Amino acid sequence: MSAPTILIMAGGTGGHIMPGLAVAEVLRERGWRVLWLGNPDKMEGRLVPPRGIELVPLRFQGVRGRGAAALLKLPFLLARACAQAWRRLADIRPDVVLGMGGYVAFPGGVMAALRRMPLVVHEQNAVAGTANRWLARLARRVLSGFPGVLPRGEALGNPVRADLCALPEPAERYAGRSGALRVLVVGGSLGAHALNTTVPQALALLPEQARPQVVHQAGEQHLPALQQAYAQAGVQADCRAFIDDMAGAMAQADLLICRAGAMTVSEVAAAGVAALFVPFPHAIDDHQTANARFLSDAQAAWLQPQATLTPQWLAQWLGQRTRQELQAVAGRARTHALPRAAAHIADVCEQAARRAS
């Protein structure tokens, strides 16, 4: 008997691709054949093939925010992508199709539904993306990382790395710590200019004996400017382009200052670390603010809009934090973790395939 086949559709950003890869790994361990529908010219073209997963090419990208000329081309681009997806699905004949978001998932999902192939959709963010809002109407099962995102949605969580889920409980990690608070600042692989400029200036406003120990990840492109910003502020910090062991860095931190992508928020909960979220203000539909509120509304994190993140505000806010308070917030964050999300999404895919057979 041949192995069952799943076609995963995801692309454009790591927030769609990485959770898809986590589900792919679970299904491969269960004996499934995994194929990936994506644009070889985009991020999935760099991330998926090195994992030993065949990338089935489909070139399609969104036109939102690209102007009137791009919008006029949309019907032609979409028709071409749908024709490509129809042929790819005919060749592959997958037992189930999983859409994890990104524009490339839309034509593939529509064609899968027209071919009456079981379609499962997973939305990572607290505000559904354009493709998933439409595909949810066609899907057999609708899954999400956060509650209340889509009609018929089942909140199974976002797949996160096992090393984060395996960290000891916050009470155990924070116990016995003394001295300056340990702050981890993460701007993502490309850095975050607002954090890179505001944090050094804020720390300079604090008395030297009240300053936390800082590890600040800025992205390779922004590292020299970040180091200069700390030097000009007269503040010592461990500035890094990348952090290879993010689980270890989170385990050592009393506080994380970061953006609020869906995966970041889910990782904060999985690790059980206190976080100050500064959502990226230009995210589509302001979805990062909605992501952050999943924890901040439960007093399991803090949320500060970038527009009001000033050095003066941040200095005052940091000066008011205690390790005991941070431990309590970290503990509340951990209660919102869904560490088996990847396995549960894989379960749903298997169920959908069985019901269609």
Swiss-Prot record:
One CC-aspect GO term: plasma membrane
* InterPro entries (UniProt xref): GlcNAc_MurG (IPR006009), Glyco_trans_28_C (IPR007235), GlycoTrans_28_N (IPR004276)
Question: Domain of life, per the record?
Answer: Bacteria
Q: Which residues bind UDP-N-acetyl-alpha-D-glucosamine?
A: 13-15, 125, 161, 189, 243, 288
Keywords on record: Cell cycle, Cell division, Cell inner membrane, Cell membrane, Cell shape, Cell wall biogenesis/degradation, Glycosyltransferase, Membrane, Peptidoglycan synthesis, Transferase
Q: Which PANTHER family match?
A: GLYCOSYLTRANSFERASE (PTHR21015:SF22), UDP-N-ACETYLGLUCOSAMINE--N-ACETYLMURAMYL-(PENTAPEPTIDE) PYROPHOSPHORYL-UNDECAPRENOL N-ACETYLGLUCOSAMINE TRANSFERASE 1 (PTHR21015)
What is the role of this chain? Cell wall formation. Catalyzes the transfer of a GlcNAc subunit on undecaprenyl-pyrophosphoryl-MurNAc-pentapeptide (lipid intermediate I) to form undecaprenyl-pyrophosphoryl-MurNAc-(pentapeptide)GlcNAc (lipid intermediate II).
HAMAP family, per the entry? MurG
User: Under what name is this protein listed?
Assistant: UDP-N-acetylglucosamine--N-acetylmuramyl-(pentapeptide) pyrophosphoryl-undecaprenol N-acetylglucosamine transferase
Question: Which organism is this protein's natural source?
Answer: Bordetella parapertussis (strain 12822 / ATCC BAA-587 / NCTC 13253)
The record lists the lineage as: Bacteria, Pseudomonadati, Pseudomonadota, Betaproteobacteria, Burkholderiales
Q: Which gene encodes it?
A: murG
